[in-house]
Every structure is written in C-alpha cells, then in structure tokens.
C-alpha cells in the first residue's frame, strides 16, 4: 500500500476505530506532526492519553479514545490562511461556530484556529476535528 500522507492515515485510523467503538487505536508510522496534532486534540478533550512507543523503526503511537470524536480529516494541499481568512475556513469546514477546531501550522508552532487568532498569526491548514 502506498502512503500518500502519514497524518491522513493516522487520522483516518482514529476515525474508523472511533466509529467501531474501540477504546484505543495504534497508529504507525509516527511523526512529529502527528504528535503535535494529537496534543491539540488532547488539549480540547477529544482524545484521552496517548503514548509514543519507540520500536527503533518509525515508531508507534497508542491513543486512548473517549468517544467524543465525530469527524477528523486532513486538508490537502495545505492552503495558506491569513488571520482574516480563518473565519471563512471555520465556516466551510466545521459544523458550527461553537465546537470543532481547525489545526494550523504557523511560524509559532502547530495550534488550533482560536489560538492562532489570539496570537494574530496565519499559516497553513493541516486539518480539522470535531
């Protein structure tokens, strides 16, 4: 199987496991971008704890699911988004303004759209979850 996007594979396996009612899922291979994305999801309570397992290859991540994740996905290609354009992207990708987050990679690190708006930085859209 050809891997186009490691982040896409990780989010899709989490989404599928969540829909099947699983309590945990193993993601491999791992990357720094996946770990940062998971930290943002964990900060907002959409997943539980996760653990990085070093197998001296590409690594694995075991994620505890808590049943809050409805949908998550990757936006490819990674479109440039200015601070003023974030609102349009939230309207396009998320079901409502009250919940859900868009994850951006910015010059100040990987963060959700609300934190990017507070820090007044734009960046590239990585993905979303709600």
Swiss-Prot record:
UniProt keyword annotations, A-Z: Cytoplasm, Ribonucleoprotein, Ribosomal protein
Keyword Membrane tagged: no
Gene: RPS15AA
Superkingdom as given in the UniProt entry: Eukaryota
Pfam family, one: Ribosomal_S8
Entry-linked PROSITE patterns: RIBOSOMAL_S8
Gene Ontology CC, one term: plasmodesma
Entry-linked PANTHER family: 40S RIBOSOMAL PROTEIN S15A
Location of this chain's protein in the cell: Cytoplasm
HAMAP family reported in the protein's UniProt record: Ribosomal_uS8_A
Major localisation: cytoplasm
Protein name per UniProt: Small ribosomal subunit protein uS8z/uS8w
GO biological process: translation
Family the entry assigns: Belongs to the universal ribosomal protein uS8 family.
GO molecular function, one term: structural constituent of ribosome
């Amino acid at each position: 199987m050809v891997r186009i996007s490691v982040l896409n594979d990780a989010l899709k396996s989490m989404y599928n496991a969540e829909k099947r009612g699983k309590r945990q899922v193993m993601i491999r291979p791992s990357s720094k971008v996946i770990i940062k994305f998971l930290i943002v999801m964990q900060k907002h309570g959409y997943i539980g704890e996760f653990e990085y397992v070093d197998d001296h290859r590409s690594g694995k991540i075991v994620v505890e699911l808590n049943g809050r994740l409805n949908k998550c996905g990757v936006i490819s290609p990674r479109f440039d988004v200015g601070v003023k354009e974030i609102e349009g992207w939230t309207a396009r990708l998320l079901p409502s303004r009250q919940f859900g987050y868009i994850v951006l990679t910015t010059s100040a690190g990987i963060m959700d759209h609300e934190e990017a708006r507070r820090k007044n930085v734009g960046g590239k859209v990585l993905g979303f979850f709600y």
